[in-house]
Each structure stands twice: as C-alpha cells, then as structure tokens.
Amino acid sequence: MTPVKVWQERVEIPTYETGPQDIHPMFLENRVYQGSSGAVYPYGVTDTLSEQKTLKSWQAVWLENDYIKVMILPELGGRVHRAWDKVKQRDFVYHNEVIKPALVGLLGPWISGGIEFNWPQHHRPTTFMPVDFTLEAHEDGAQTGWVGETEPMHGLQVMTGFTLRPGRRWKSPAASITATPRRVISCGGPTRQ
C-alpha cells in the first residue's frame, strides 16, 4: 500500500473580503444568537462585506491516498474545504469554489461549503479566523491533520483531527476538548489570581 501523502501549499481562491473587525468588543445582553447569549467579548464584530471579488491566496493542507484527497484551510477556521473522491472523480462534500462570507456567524462572517467545526456553539466565533494546525505521521503510513485553538470566550482548548489511512476510502475524525484551568483573558491591565 502507498503511504498517505501530506503537503502544504498556497491555493488561490476567488474571495469576497470582509470589512474591518470592530476594535471595541460589544458587551451585548439579550442578543440571543442560535442558542447563545449573543455575548462576544473579547472579540469584535465584523458587520460589513465587500461586493468585490479578488483572487486571494490561502494556506492549504492536503492529505491524499489512492482513493481520496482532502484540503483543509487553517486560515478559515480549520475547515475541510474540499474532499475529492479520486475513483468517481467528484467532490463528496459540498465544495464552494468561491469564498463569499455572509453575516450569519456570531462575529459576523461565515461561509458555506466543506465541513465546519463548531465549539462552543453553532457557527463558532472563530469560524472565519486562522487556527493552529499540526501534522502527525503514523507508523502504518497514515497521516493526521490536526486543527485547533484555545478559544478565549470560554477557555476551551479544542483540537479536531482527520486521519487518512493507506488503502481506505474514508477519513477518520477525532476530537480533543480541554477546559483550561483558567479563562484566557485578553486585556492589558493587571489581573488577580
């Protein structure tokens, strides 16, 4: 069996830009948003979108075996943007060929297509922001692409991994969720312990 190939590259995707994020976090109450309170501190909200499409370069992480090829975009929340069936020559998850945000996420921008990871709620706050990623090689020739973050609103450290194995027609998802001992506080002032 051929080992799984993994690589990183820049890909150009037609993209509609967002406006700037408000630098002043909103302390909102009673703004119910898809089961949440609507509070967004310490983030700012983006409430404008561009109507101009440009060709933008995004970092892509690829996993490929004899049957499928998967593209993960760490700069867009770590989503699986494309999953291609090499045998049937077609996408097996919805592949949106254009990045065109809509203002439906908790902080504003959200895009359709691919597989989006959500924590602590639907259309998570950082769904349109960069996340950390790492690659893990396994002895059997498999490769895992991990994406994750420590989310400052709730102090959750979350990682999602996709493992692609040689000779298999599917990818195996895995998740790790850790409640950090203290909330991450993004401020410049003194804090008490």
Regions found by a protein language model. Give the residues of each.
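Intrinsically disordered regions, especially transient/low-confidence alpha-helical propensity segments
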Residues: 4, 55, 107, 116, ...
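Acidic, contiguous internal or C-terminal segments within carbohydrate-active enzymes
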Residues: 70-88, 148-193
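Acidic-aromatic substrate-binding/catalytic surfaces of carbohydrate-active enzymes
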Residues: 2-40, 60-130
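Extended, loop-rich substrate-binding clefts of extracytoplasmic carbohydrate-active enzymes
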Residues: 27-56, 60-64, 112-169
